[in-house]
A protein has these predicted regions:
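Phosphate-backbone binding interfaces of nucleic-acid-interacting proteins
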Residues: 206
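Core mixed alpha/beta domains of very large multi-subunit molecular machines
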Residues: 1-203
Length: 206
């Protein structure tokens, strides 16, 4: 009986140790800030999206305006750029070479396409949801409008209004935020409740 009890005790202890190891591994290696989930799942981008450091927009602007860095915009708007390049009879190889080059270098043709895209946008610009992970509080995700791509590839930052930083609990000390471009106008319309001015009042008091 003692032997059976000892064996059962060892079995229970082994199960307990395995459970403890699993919990600690998940906490330290998967769920922590440098963990696997943040590296490979939460930090992985969907198309078309981007993530970059934020800075304040210090030129005259609308409160819901967003200016994107050059290299980030080339990546996020690759499909849009390829669509225009195909109209001008670029081959797939030529498109790949041009977009690879312009990821880190300014190019007049790409800037012309960017300006054309914004000019043809049905709204104020291209609507994007803008979020600072991992915040999920009200107004942490806002619908802003991408109106300009910075022409200096050396500036790797998104710029947006000081009026929009409270909801996403952001500041300009190196914080990064992510932007996702809705795939069609129907989805953009459904996201309109995320506009910054719709979070100006408390949902419980007004």
């Amino acid at each position: 009986e003692l032997r059976v009890g000892a064996r059962e005790n060892r079995t229970a202890k082994a199960i307990s140790d395995i459970a403890h190891f699993t919990l600690e591994y998940a906490r330290n290696n998967i769920g922590s800030k440098p963990g696997l989930a943040r590296k490979h799942m939460f930090s992985s981008r969907v198309m078309p999206s981007s993530r970059a450091v934020i800075t304040s927009l210090n030129r005259p602007h609308r409160y819901d305006e967003l200016h994107a860095p050059w290299s980030v915009a080339v990546g996020m708007l690759t499909t849009h750029l390829e669509n225009y390049l195909m109209r001008w009879d670029f081959t797939p190889q030529e498109m790949l070479e041009l977009l690879s080059y312009t990821t880190t270098n300014w190019h007049p043709l790409i800037e012309h396409i960017f300006k054309t895209i914004f000019a043809q946008a049905p709204a104020k610009g291209l609507p994007v949801t803008y979020c600072r992970n991992p915040s999920l509080e009200r107004a942490s995700i806002q619908l802003l409008y991408l109106t300009l791509v910075k022409s200096d590839p050396r500036d790797p930052t998104y710029s947006f209004s000081l009026l929009d930083i409270v909801g996403c609990n952001a500041d300009f000390d190196g914080d990064e935020m992510s932007a996702i471009l809705p795939v069609d106008n129907e989805l953009a319309h459904l996201l309109e409740p995320l506009k910054p001015h719709k979070s100006a009042h408390s949902v419980t008091k007004y």
